Amino acid sequence: MPAHFQRARNEEQRAVRRQAILDTAAAMLTDMPVAEVSLNALSRRVCLAKSNVLRYFESREEILLELLDAESRAWLDHLARELPTAVGADAPPATRGDGLAAVLARSLATRPVLCDLISAQAAVLERNVSPAVALTYKRAALANAEVLAGLVRGCVPELDERGALRLAGAVFLTAGSVWTHAHPSSAVRAAYEADPALAEMRLDFTETLQEVLEVFAAGLLARRRVD
């Protein structure tokens, strides 16, 4: 049991119990995809009744949105340490844009939990929450996008603030989409194996994401030069 008391009787104990629920859900995501993390299974793992879990979070989706924010912030902290030395400051803008795309794609590929959560965000996680929870999450998501935009401008200062924020938004949007297509169902994988002509439809996550981000960054830089 994650806490030694049976009932949270004050704010400190409530915070401990709430964090225990989040930590348990995070541990589950290392063993299974987002789609398999149910509220019932989480309740059993955290040794609480389902009704008690719902005292701390209004739904499974709220829990997972909080984890998505936490995973995003952890990734951004890592990027802030990696990017300054990973992208050559003296290279031409286009080369730095390509280098940035490569670092972002490789970095996200090492964080499957984050990518899985991003892929479920709009279609699943935002569908069973109250306006208050949605507002909290969207504010956090915007803050994370602004942090990423700042890191983007550190590598490619030729982009203005709006362009950097657009690229940051594209990173999150594209990562979720590419992750889903790069991890198809067993039936689709079997179809790929059965027909070699479908080989071109099989996507490698890192390679595909890098290529898309390279094109997006190049387009923003080209538009900036024209403007």
Region locations from a protein language model:
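C-terminal peripheral helix-coil segments that are non-catalytic and often amphipathic
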Residues: 142-158, 177-227
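Helix-turn-helix
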Residues: 28, 35-62, 66
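Helical hydrophobic small-molecule/effector-binding pocket
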Residues: 98-129, 181-183
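Alpha-helical structural segments
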Residues: 16, 20-27, 62-85, 106, ...
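Membrane-interface starts of transmembrane alpha-helices
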Residues: 156, 160-168
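Basic, helix-initiating cap at the start of DNA-binding domains
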Residues: 1-33, 40-44, 87-92
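Amphipathic alpha-helical interaction segments
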Residues: 20, 41, 99-103, 166-173, ...
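Hydrophobic alpha-helical connector segments
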Residues: 66, 80-114, 136, 167-171
